[in-house]
Structure formats: structure tokens, C-alpha cells
């Protein structure tokens, strides 16, 4: 009987031991502070936070009281701080941005409008950051919480200021930063001869004029970005009680989690603390709801086209919406169009308007034939993951560059949403659906993207935990951060060697000149004196 009891106890203890060994250990659990940015930036970060919580870590998210997407969650603790603006102001800023892309104003007027909007929105966001940093009670409570690390999106460097104020190692979660601030802050080489600048629409194989364009953008982008980023340097200088620039704020980051992949991006140099996690938002596809399953099944052999211009575009001008509706009505596929604006009067029977759609799940369905997208990084990677050729209508920001990259890889067709006609959209859709090369190219990219030793989400979680365990990753920080600009480019060494060469040349020249005078100058004087004596 005792033998049986001992055997039963052993069997009961075995799962417990396995849980202790394989499960999250309380002794290794850490505390992570998260300072996100509202919108798609936050939505892409949620998977990492959820995984960290499931592994036993305590996650605290801080956000302004006026937030659209950042809400309470079951796998993190939410702490909100007061700001001098309301939810309506944030919503209005997003709506105005989506509406402005369809403006047909002259170029210079659009530039002025964009500049004023960027300045206005930046001022609002800066005021929110300032209210956080000047909230002494709130900041003191964060300091007393003894976090192990900070996870933030450096697109707005408020989290970077908090990290330095609390002396926390920082992990950055981003796609890219404007004006190549990410490359500058990481000291990452980016030769202008083959690394295209953001917003240039160049490829990595540039002709002479494209390289000239690349150089001009490089020379002017820092000036343009001062509107957004220089005030953060001034705010940080006040809070940290030392003179700092935005580059000084960003460069101490331990790890840069970049939502990039060389399947989409052109090959270029990267630094040891830059980790590529492109496709992290490509979640495992789920079963469709009855509503969407019915739409897909009703499409028959022709299949479906998924159409979304992102959450920022809530309304399209009537004339443009009717042109789009006309083009969609000319194809045999069923079109699922995510659109919250006014229903076009000429909407065809094959086009279904929905206020929301499970984009990744629909793209993962075997009947998905094409994807009409605004070329945001989320949509591009979901198109790659699921192997669906794209018709791209970039609207602003890095979307133009994303579309260019996919087009050069033969995975889609790009249209100018302002200039395109119904015929253009119809032809583009028929091209990517009927020309097999587009499907073959996107499937090849999908295969390359998925052929990796570790999933992007697991890789991101590993590096966040790594920084929490080791209190940073200083061994990955290059010494370039500690050099002056002339030391980095070895200008002092070049100057020193040049001085030596010039000195040697000068000495040799003087020696030769002296020798020539001795050899030839003396004979001349002797001959001259001899002639004078004969006379």
C-alpha cells in the first residue's frame, strides 16, 4: 500500500516540478514600465506586453487621460495622468490628418498647411509630455516603484526623458524615426550612395539624379525636424538639469526593436543593438465570424478583394469615392471595403461596406485574391505574411517608401490616390489578380519572411527580458557614441598624416633646392667670374 501511495505522490509531484521548471519563476519576474504612443503604434505593441505578462512580469502602462486606443487591459496595469487636452482634440487631429491627404490645393499651400498642422499637433503632444514630467507626485510614485526597464516608442521621445530621469535601461519599439534620427542615435552607418532617405521614394539602386535627391534630403531633413523634436530637447534640459539634445536622449537605449525585415526593406548596415522584428503584427489567423464567412463563401470561384485605407481615413471626397466604387464594380470579385464615410451612390452589388473587418484573417483565407491598402507597415506585412498581391495607395509618411519597396519586388502596383481614375484602379486590380507573376513574387517573399529560427514576437520578448535581467546591454553599445564628430570620421588622424606628408614633401623639396643651388649655382658663378677676368 505504501509503495502505491509513494508512486501516486510521485506522479502528482511530477507536473508540479515541470511547472516550476518551465513556468514563469517569481524570482525572475520583473517590473516593466511602458510609455506608448496612441494609434497603430500602441496596437502593435500589445502582443509584446501580453506575452511578458503571461511570463510572470508585472507591466505598468502610463498614458494621458485623453487617449483613443490606449485603454484598460486585463494583462497590464493602467495609470493615467492629466493633460491639458481632451479626447475630442486627439480624435480631431487624427480625422484632420486623414482628410488632408485628399486636399487638391497647390503644392506650396499644402506644404504650409502641413507645416502648420505638424506644429500644432506637436505642440499638443509636447504639452502632454510636459504635464507628465512636471507632475511631481506622479513621477515620484514611478520612482518608488523600482522598475527594471522601460519600453517605449521613441517616435515621441517623452519616454526617453522618463527613462533618463528614472535611470532605467530603455528598450525602443519602432518602425523608423523621421529624419533618420534612429540611424543617427545608434551611430549606424547609412551611405547615401545606396541607402535611400525616408520620403525619397528612391530604391537602393539610384542613378546620379536620384543620388543628388538623396543628398539634398539628407542636408535639409534635420532643419525640417526641428519643428517637432527640438522642443523635447529643451524640455529634457529643464527636467534633467543638463544640456541635452534629442540625439542625447535617444542614444542611451539598450535595444532598438525595429519592426523591419530585409524581405521588405533594402539591405543596409545595422548595429549590434538593433533587432529586426518585422511582421510582429502578423498574428495567427483566426476563424472568420459567420458574417464574414458568408461573404467569402458567396464570392464563389472569383474570391474576394480586401480594401482598407487604415483607421485614419474615415471619409473620402464624394467624387473620389464614386470613382473607386465604379472601378470596384467592374471586377468579378467580391470586395470587402472598410469604410465609415458616406456610402457612394453608385456602389455595386459586389462591394460590401463594413465599419471594421478582420484584415489579417481575411487575407489569410484561400479566397483572398488582392489587397487594396494605404501601404502602412501593418498592412504591408500582413500582405506579405499571407501572400496576397497588393494595389497600394500611399497617403502620407513612410507609406510612399513602403509602396516603392513592394513595387520593386514585383509584389504589387502603386497608384496615386489623388490622380488615379476608375480605369487606373480597375486595370491595377486586374493586373495583380490575373498576372501570375505578382502572386508568385508575393508568395516568394512570404516564404522568405517566414523562414526564420524564431518568431518576431518571441524575439522581441526575449530582448525585453534580457534588458530587464541584465539592467541594460552596455556591451552592445559601440564606442562611436563616445567620439567627437571629427574623431568618428578620423579627420584628426587624416590631418595629422597629411601634415606629416606635407612636412616630408617640404623637407625633400628644400633639400633638393639646396642641393641644386650647391651643384649648379656654384659652377655658374665660377664661369661668370672667369669670363670677367679675360676681359
Swiss-Prot record:
Subunit architecture: Homodimers. Homooligomer. Interacts with UGT1A3, UGT1A4, UGT1A6, UGT1A7, UGT1A8, UGT1A9 and UGT1A10 to form heterodimers.
Record's signal peptide: 1-29
Classification via InterPro entries: UDP-glycosyltransferase, UDP_glucos_trans, UDP_glycos_trans_CS
Known glycosylation sites: 89, 297, 435
Catalytic activity: glucuronate acceptor + UDP-alpha-D-glucuronate = acceptor beta-D-glucuronoside + UDP + H(+); 17beta-estradiol + UDP-alpha-D-glucuronate = 17beta-estradiol 3-O-(beta-D-glucuronate) + UDP + H(+); 2-hydroxyestrone + UDP-alpha-D-glucuronate = 2-hydroxyestrone 3-O-(beta-D-glucuronate) + UDP + H(+); 2-hydroxy-17beta-estradiol + UDP-alpha-D-glucuronate = 2-hydroxy-17beta-estradiol 3-O-(beta-D-glucuronate) + UDP + H(+)
Expression induction: Induced in 3-methylcholanthrene-treated rats.
Gene Ontology MF: a single term: retinoic acid binding
Name of the protein in its database record: UDP-glucuronosyltransferase 1A1
Species this chain originates from: Rattus norvegicus
Alphabetic keyword roster: Endoplasmic reticulum, Glycoprotein, Glycosyltransferase, Lipid metabolism, Membrane, Signal, Transferase, Transmembrane, Transmembrane helix
Broad class of where this protein is predominantly found: endoplasmic reticulum
